[in-house]
Amino acid sequence: MTKLGFLRLSYEKQDTLLKLLILSMAAVLSFSTRLFAVLRFESVIHEFDPYFNYRTTRFLAEEGFYKFHNWFDDRAWYPLGRIIGGTIYPGLMITSAAIYHVLHFFHITIDIRNVCVFLAPLFSSFTTIVTYHLTKELKDAGAGLLAAAMIAVVPGYISRSVAGSYDNEGIAIFCMLLTYYMWIKAVKTGSIYWAAKCALAYFYMVSSWGGYVFLINLIPLHVLVLMLTGRFSHRIYVAYCTVYCLGTILSMQISFVGFQPVLSSEHMAAFGVFGLCQIHAFVDYLRSKLNPQQFEVLFRSVISLVGFVLLTIGALLMLTGKISPWTGRFYSLLDPSYAKNNIPIIASVSEHQPTTWSSYYFDLQLLVFMFPVGLYYCFSNLSDARIFIIMYGVTSMYFSAVMVRLMLVLAPVMCILSGIGVSQVLSTYMKNLDISRQDKKSKKQQDSTYPIKNEVASGMILVMAFFLITYTFHSTWVTSEAYSSPSIVLSARGGDGSRIIFDDFREAYYWLRHNTPEDAKVMSWWDYGYQITAMANRTILVDNNTWNNTHISRVGQAMASTEEKAYEIMRELDVSYVLVIFGGLTGYSSDDINKFLWMVRIGGSTDTGKHIKEHDYYTPTGEFRVDREGSPVLLNCLMYKMCYYRFGQVYTEAKRPLGYDRVRNAEIGNKDFELDVLEEAYTTEHWLVRIYKVKDLDNRGLSRT
């Protein structure tokens, strides 16, 4: 007996050790696969928004939380400025600053920039661990390990968590899955302890990302479905009431959120379900005290009265403005055409565009096919927790189709349900595999179809193993080629296969920092505002915060106008330098000419820009062209002239004419012109960034020198 007990304990230890080893390998893989950019380039911040996050984190680490919370940034949105503490989700910055100070406390000296660069890969490892525990609650440890391995390399999540991608989503996905895990534990146990931990995880989520609104609507929806399916119980009541009350109070401590949880339409579903919980509990109490006839009469009366009162109060609050309406971004989730028709500034952001079919396969690959299998398993074995994951999967699938950015929210549930699906398929077919010769003989005697079953099972397991291997290779390739290139440092392959580096952005920002006055104001399109402020340390007019559409529209009007009209706007805004991005020489397609129509649309969306009409920039046949057939309005606007100044004297390709644009594949139509109100200040090595100085009026204000 003692020997058998020892063997059993030893097996359990081996099982635990094996699980720990696999999970640790998945976590290490999750971290290491996100380091391509650091190995290929250097430790550098990516994209645009991360530069603002890095700048604010550096300020927090150096100056402390009090100054950070009360920081008024006079470098942004000139002449308006921006209050930082009350307009951001501080969770990301506080997390990085805390890690930075803890490491320095133990005399591990690391620059705050490197903390920011490696934070997202670190939290992706934590996400792997949370995914394991969450999936384990839904099925078993095997499914959890598969889901953890899948989320470690899934491109849909890697796209926002590579080293250098210092954005809110880098830690928010971990916070979201942690909240879901705590919620499922609270639902299963009905424990205030787990519900309180869920509320704390939700608070961390709120402090980190505006996407918390998805979470605070999904959990109430789960409770509502449990009510409708007759699964509502004391456990659900305790869990939801604790999470809602404590979570709402905690979330209101974030300055940027404030009273929104009790005043905005996005949060009213959670409040409504909280009220329904009280009504449901009260009805259950009445049912226990009254006979069926009395209860039915009272129930109908109470429901009718409560429904009428709630609708009346809700309508009055909406009409009086006490409850704010849905914001443009949320309207665009329900109606994908809303932003395009009403708010061009939202529609102009590439990550707000609808998702293409190819993006699903590109970002998810095998998961697209295994997701329905996991969904089927959950439907076949319904429980409170599985109903939640079904709803998470279905709702995130819809929202990801509306907005490509929300592929990030879909990727984790794809991994969870695919892990469940693969685990179920493998466990089903592995039951038919023979383990020993004795088992094989007995099975042959009992089942004449055994050999066929054995071969089919072996084939299915091999096929599944092949698909999992191809998923790994695909994910690694996508990570390396598509998601590990920092936008601030570009690269291309030369004719001999060598890598060519285009470091024009940092070159331009370095020039601005050292060759312009400290108080110089730089006008550019809003995409580059955060980078200019963080790297050049110069005042900008607009940036990626896009909180003031009128101000952005004014910049768009300047870009879309003639030099004379643009000069009036630039003098009005006290502009010293103008910066544009031009890819005609190198073939960089994300330049300002390709973004120009959005400048026209946004510029013409306000009263001061009513004279700017989009159709004026097209040819009579409705084409947007930069060659001789192009619209005269386009060929003479400020943006065109700044991009193509002196370009008509340049050869870009062999056997092509002077001034051949490699992005638009056309010879430019307006070559021989001079600038009247601007003078070229600096053009980078590959012409990617061009900086112009605004000429001053003479003393009498009559002519420019």
Curated annotation (Swiss-Prot):
EC numbers, comma separated: 2.4.99.18
- Residue(s) at site: Interacts with target acceptor peptide in protein substrate: 49, 351, 595
- Residues annotated to bind Mn(2+): 49, 167, 169
Q: Which residues lie on this side of the membrane: Lumenal?
A: 39-119, 159-169, 207-211, 260-267, 322-356, 403-406, 474-705
| Side Cytoplasmic, residues | 1-17, 139-140, 190-191, 229-233, 288-300, 380-385, 429-453
Where does the record say this protein resides? Answer: Endoplasmic reticulum membrane
Site Important for catalytic activity — annotated at: 160
Q: Which Pfam family, any one, appears in the UniProt record?
A: STT3
Membrane-traversing stretches: 18-38, 120-138, 141-158, 170-189, 192-206, 212-228, 234-259, 268-287, 301-321, 357-379, 386-402, 407-428, 454-473
Q: What does this protein do?
A: Catalytic subunit of the oligosaccharyl transferase (OST) complex that catalyzes the initial transfer of a defined glycan (Glc(3)Man(9)GlcNAc(2) in eukaryotes) from the lipid carrier dolichol-pyrophosphate to an asparagine residue within an Asn-X-Ser/Thr consensus motif in nascent polypeptide chains, the first step in protein N-glycosylation. N-glycosylation occurs cotranslationally and the complex associates with the Sec61 complex at the channel-forming translocon complex that mediates protein translocation across the endoplasmic reticulum (ER).
- Please state what the protein is called: Dolichyl-diphosphooligosaccharide--protein glycosyltransferase subunit STT3A
Q: Which organism is it from?
A: Bos taurus
